[in-house]
Curated annotation (Swiss-Prot):
Molecular function GO terms recorded: magnesium ion binding; thiamine-phosphate diphosphorylase activity
Database matches in Pfam families: TMP-TENI
Organism: Azoarcus sp. (strain BH72)
The protein's name: Thiamine-phosphate synthase
Family according to the record: Belongs to the thiamine-phosphate synthase family.
Length: 206
């Protein structure tokens, strides 16, 4: 990746139906998040494909890169900008072989420094640590210390993402510790005014 990407990294919420999901995303895209990740652990593959295609169109129109969670094949099928890999989703090199040299490939590193080193060495475009705080999306997720963000920012060439339980109140501490990207679901999409909340996050990076 060229210029170091920084800002709000929006992750889609679980939604009862596709229309609700797409309306929620369309509402916040004017905030121009740095990235938008499509994450849906509940839908069947056909619905995932339909939603990802629709999100691709919305994101392309808004100039926001679309990342697909955990599914290289789906990312390729909809010509997404990249993929986010978890523990069992393969290597950055394998994903790049499928998606191409320009794909944005992120890797979940949880609280594991060695995993982050390995991911960066394998060509990851960003590494993600978390949960940084208790998370309603993943209540049992392992907690990662803020010191990992600082260490990664100093030692790795790729951007550093923080995820898990992030709010406007704790976000400044994460940025100060070294986070380039703040991955947020609930604190934006469950807000009374999601667009204004997203804009408030983006302003933290101004």
């Amino acid at each position: 990746m060229g210029e170091r990407i920084r800002g709000l990294y929006l992750v889609t919420p679980d939604a009862a139906d596709s229309a609700t999901l797409l309306a929620s995303v369309e509402r916040v895209l004017p905030a121009r998040p740095a990235l938008l990740q499509y994450r849906n652990k509940l839908a069947d593959p056909l619905r995932q494909l339909d939603e990802a295609r629709s999100l691709r169109q919305l994101c392309s129109s808004a100039g926001v890169p679309l990342i697909i969670n955990d599914d290289v094949a789906l990312a390729r099928a909809v010509a997404a900008d990249g993929v986010h890999l978890g523990r069992d989703d393969g290597s950055p090199a394998a994903a790049r072989a499928v998606l191409g040299a320009d794909a944005l490939i992120g890797v979940s590193c949880y609280d594991e420094w060695v995993r982050a080193e390995d991911a960066a060495a394998a060509g990851a475009d960003y590494v993600a640590f978390g949960a940084m705080f208790p998370s309603s999306t993943k209540p049992g997720a392992v907690r990662a210390p803020l010191t990992l963000l600082t260490r990664a920012r100093a030692a790795l060439d790729c951007p550093v993402a923080a995820i898990g339980g992030i709010t406007l109140d704790n976000a400044p501490a994460l940025i100060e510790a070294g986070a380039d990207l703040l991955a947020v679901i609930s604190d934006v999409f469950a807000a009374a005014d999601p667009l204004q909340r997203a804009l408030a996050y983006s302003a933290l990076f101004a």
